[in-house]
Amino acid sequence: MLGGLARKLFGSANDRRVKGYRPRVQAINALEPELEALSDEALRARTEDFRRQLAEGKTLDDLLVPAFATVREGAKRALGMRPFDVQLIGGMVMHEAGIAEMKTGEGKTLVATLPVYLNALAGKGVHVVTVNDYLAKRDAEWMGRLYRFLGLTTGIIVHGLDDDERRVAYASDVTYATNNELGFDYLRDNMKYERGQMVQRPHFYAIVDEVDSILIDEARTPLIISGPLDDRSDFYNTIDTYIPRLGKEDYEVDEKQRSVSMTEAGMEKMEQMLSAAGVLKSASLYDIENVSVVHHVNQALRAHTLFQRDKDYIVRNDEVVIIDEFTGRMMPGRRYSEGLHQALEAKERVQVQPENQTLASITFQNYFRLYEKLSGMTGTANTEAAEFADIYKLEVVEIPTNVQISRIDDDDEVYRTAGEKYAAIIELIKECAERSQPVLVGTTSIEKSELLAELLKQAGFRQKDFSDPTAFNGRELLINDRSGKSFAVLNARYHEQEAYIVSQAGVPGAITIATNMAGRGTDIKLGGSADMRIEIELKDLPEGAERAAAEAKIRAEVEELKQKALEAGGLYVLGTERHESRRIDNQLRGRSGRQGDPGHSKFFLSLDDDLMRIFGSDRLDGMLQRLGLKEGEAIIHPWINKALEKAQQKVEARNYDMRKNVLKYDDVLNDQRKVVFEQRVELMNDEDVAETVEDMRHALITETVAKFIPENAYPEQWDVDGLDTALKEMLALDLPVKDWAKEEGIAGPEVTERIIRRADELMAAKTAQYGPDIMRYVEKSILLQTLDHLWREHIGMLDHLRQVVGLRGYAQRDPLNEYKSEAFNLFSALLNRLREVVTAQLMRVEIVTQQPPPEELPPMEAHHADPFTGEDELAFAGAALGSRPQPLLSGDLAVAERDPNDPESWGKVGRNEACPCGSGKKYKHCHGRFA
């Protein structure tokens, strides 16, 4: 109460922050007449003038007012749009590394051009981050007109570009890209073997569109690049056959935590079945030999109990395709990790694809913290303001709307059963259709959107068929859309038609059923989209007077339809249940009432809804029965809204804690990742790494000698045999250590010195034999390849450690501290192993002068994996090492030219290589069987 009174008297902190920007807005407005008088060339010349001022010592803050004024004038000329005063404020918030919360339709895309232009003047590159390729292309082409007008270059990073195209795009002043592509490029860059092959520049400044979706919803989802492992499809299919034989008493499902665990009875039953089938390697299911079997049994159980077809995934073209829980979009190529996707494929009886091994990974939380400066924009961020401040040090500022919102938000209607709820929804849709009011119906899953579609068909409505992407025949289809008795379904099944469906959702009488609208990125305009109609109806009409007249006619029609939609009350947003996140609900509401248009929103709930059921609908059901609530009646009260909001806050708090916990663990890996990646870049930049490998060799020899010759020990106490064996195995050195031990007055340091001298002589001889250039290249290649190989193994070990370290809590030990300690020990072991392997390989290496045939690299894939649901987002990630001819190495790395008829000449052959005999089979299936 007192807080509310204080806010009335002094204004909120947000109000005061916004007020603080007003003087600079006035200064920008004051420059407008002066800039209007400039020619296009003179306006463009200001860009170079700003850069000169920066070079002379001015800061970006010093240039904010004139730069923003220049962008405003440029936008008027290049785009026909003039940023409002509140949009200038949004731009200032983002320049100051904040998050601008701007309602739908307030022009976030245009706002971003203000801080983008200002920060691009520094010449370090600005990244504008979007959630999908469509938005990246659209915004880059649209706003690119303004940047080009002002003399800046623009690049686009989307799926399917090669490295040269990416390098050019990243070298541009402004680069539009998706969050996934940025993260994958960073990981791929740190798998390259030459500095010139990398595509990204240092991370300077990024503006993240739909920042809540990327930095909150996807925060706990690592980006993963992986390579394939051996095919185990038979194993998954075998495990899957036993899951349906379990009864409900054999496992416990926790919907709140989205987890499932077997009871003791279930474990015994599963153990008996697997033992009888010969799957177990030892008597007990929980013996160490069966750890892999237990893991896959648990994943198969999750697949059958926690994941629903048409809600979490769909089966399309004999593949299991994941559905994004936040947007309802289909994500072809994305795969669940750690065997879960294979378990789903076995469950659905489709082809089981092989598992993958992680080669590199990073979370969005850690990727975006690489930037010197980070900012964002969204329509809904305030509910997560604390998380943005805590993790990303970003302050959320609510930007006032240019025109006051006039949408009416009704209290929720709560029904006892889902059937009663849907009946009420159908009635409201009918009422809206009678007055030609456009309706947007939001659902939480494909399953529920299709259930509602079926109910509408039963009520006499016709569903538009979008199964054929080529089915659009322009004007005819648009006329059919306005019949008032047809509806469109927007979900993962019709992803290709998404832009068209959204563009027509504001036409009078339009009925659109949509899974979560988060991240759609397209405004629903009352009357429909004139641009979309022009694109469809006039696609075959060439430029000229006839086309101009046709365009004018369409725009007039759209304006007329807009007036009809306004008279009918604007867009009616109808929610069919509450989402776990208030933010998703607010995004759905925000689709209506853009730029001051009238609108309406209401949520219909039932006690069968997921959120209600998980958070105590039993008690509410008893209360409603006692109140005498009849069938078909709803209860409407602000108290219910508050109770639901509290339930949502609980879920949000739990999810925040989970994300925070993930970050604590990932920070451990992130610190190590930074060290390894920075070291890689240094090694790539070094032309000569001879000194580095020499230091490694000397340190290894010193440690090895100390292990077998204790300090101040007599020669009789030395482990001479152990040292002799170690020198032969690690360094390929056969030295008279036993004779040295018999010398009078010999000591450990002198032995160390002799071994170092002999090893250095051997390496000097190799350099003289092959030439310094070849030897330096070989040293660098071995060092980088070994580092990569050991790092991949290290990631796998840390991942395994993370899965089991929680059990140490039962021993009253803090799992996080245990993880940090173990991870440090593993990292120290990695560095020691790096010294050993690099030194051993260089001491043995022989170089064959023939040019080897080009060797195909193993296929690699990029995944976007959720550590809790296991989701992986995949994109092919070629990681070619460059076109430079590589000398052929023998020993541990490669082999000389092989004679198919002489196995003696084959040397060491990889298990998955083609057999040198020429059979076409893999080595492990041919001569390797006898090796």
UniProtKB/Swiss-Prot annotation:
Organism of origin: Xanthobacter autotrophicus (strain ATCC BAA-1158 / Py2)
Q: What keywords tag this UniProt record? A: ATP-binding, Cell inner membrane, Cell membrane, Cytoplasm, Membrane, Metal-binding, Nucleotide-binding, Protein transport, Translocase, Translocation, Transport, Zinc
* EC assignment: 7.4.2.8
Q: PROSITE patterns under this entry?
A: SECA, SECA_MOTOR_DEAD
Name under which the protein is recorded: Protein translocase subunit SecA
* Gene Ontology biological-process entries: intracellular protein transmembrane transport; protein import; protein targeting; protein transport by the Sec complex
Task: Paste the cofactor note.
Answer: May bind 1 zinc ion per subunit.
Matching Gene3D superfamilies: Helical scaffold and wing domains of SecA, P-loop containing nucleotide triphosphate hydrolases, SecA, preprotein cross-linking domain
| Gene name of the encoded protein | secA
Q: Which residues bind Zn(2+)?
A: C915, C917, C926, H927
Q: What is its cofactor?
A: Zn(2+)
